[in-house]
């Protein structure tokens, strides 16, 4: 579990990410970013090769997350809870 504060959280295979998925061969080195904003928490794909998914649908632009959403980065599933 990771608690979000006001800072964005980066996800990917590279060690430079806040949440490193180093054992996931399908995650890009820099894959996605989760960013708390005034109007909610947003997920953005940052140019990954295999895409970022929410509830099974690939996102093409930033998407606001809702509690219970399942985020897929590479072959890793993460659940967003408020």
What positions do the PLM features span?
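Forkhead-associated
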Residues: 3-82
């Amino acid at each position: 579990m990771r608690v979000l504060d006001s800072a964005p959280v980066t996800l990917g295979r590279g060690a430079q990410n806040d949440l490193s998925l180093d054992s996931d061969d399908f995650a890009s080195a820099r894959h996605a970013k989760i960013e708390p904003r005034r109007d909610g928490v947003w997920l953005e794909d940052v140019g990954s090769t295999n895409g970022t998914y929410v509830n099974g649908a690939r996102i093409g632009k930033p998407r606001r997350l809702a509690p219970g959403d399942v985020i897929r980065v590479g072959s890793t599933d993460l659940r967003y809870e408020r």
